[in-house]
């Protein structure tokens, strides 16, 4: 997934940055400037790839700890981990959204699912958040949702 993410991002950035503008003549100054822009773009793409990898790695590690807390019925630990782990997902979400089917599984809100008449398909962090903070319980459904979340996080990673 990381390589695909990088490829998608790099391709998009390169296509946008390397457009062909026939109104400009290609002289040595323009060519050197284009080379500089391409080098900067390549460097920025590498930096963003590294950053995204770091965020997704932390997201997966945190999700594993979060799911373990739920499996152990440790409400306090699950609540302590929730905002930290969500932060890593939010930071990587622009890339995660490129994989359309995974982002809604991980990050959908109930209101959005109801609007699409898909509330029975609701899963992910916000469903578990509801169990922890509104329902104030960890039950078998919460544990099943946590296992699915971990599976989806691994697939995203």
Predicted feature residues:
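Intrinsically disordered, low-complexity, charge-biased segments
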Residues: 19-33
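C-terminal motif of bacterial Sec signal peptides marking the signal peptidase cleavage site
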Residues: 14-17
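Mature extracytoplasmic or organellar-lumen-exposed domains after removal of signal/transit peptides
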Residues: 32-157
């Amino acid at each position: 997934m990381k390589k695909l993410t990088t490829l998608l991002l790099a391709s998009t950035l390169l296509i946008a940055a390397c457009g062909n503008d026939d109104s400009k003549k290609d002289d040595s100054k323009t060519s050197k400037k284009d080379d500089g822009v391409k080098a900067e773009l390549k460097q920025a793409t590498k930096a963003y790839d590294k950053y995204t990898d770091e965020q997704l790695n932390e997201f997966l590690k945190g999700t594993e700890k979060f799911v373990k807390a739920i499996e152990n019925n440790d409400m306090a630990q699950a609540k302590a981990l929730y905002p930290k782990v969500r932060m890593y997902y939010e930071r990587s979400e622009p890339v995660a959204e490129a994989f359309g089917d995974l982002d809604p599984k991980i990050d959908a809100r109930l209101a959005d699912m109801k609007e699409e008449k898909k509330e029975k398909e609701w899963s992910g962090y916000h469903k578990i958040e509801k169990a922890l903070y509104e329902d104030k319980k960890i039950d078998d459904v919460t544990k099943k949702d946590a296992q699915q979340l971990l599976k989806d996080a691994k697939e995203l990673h």
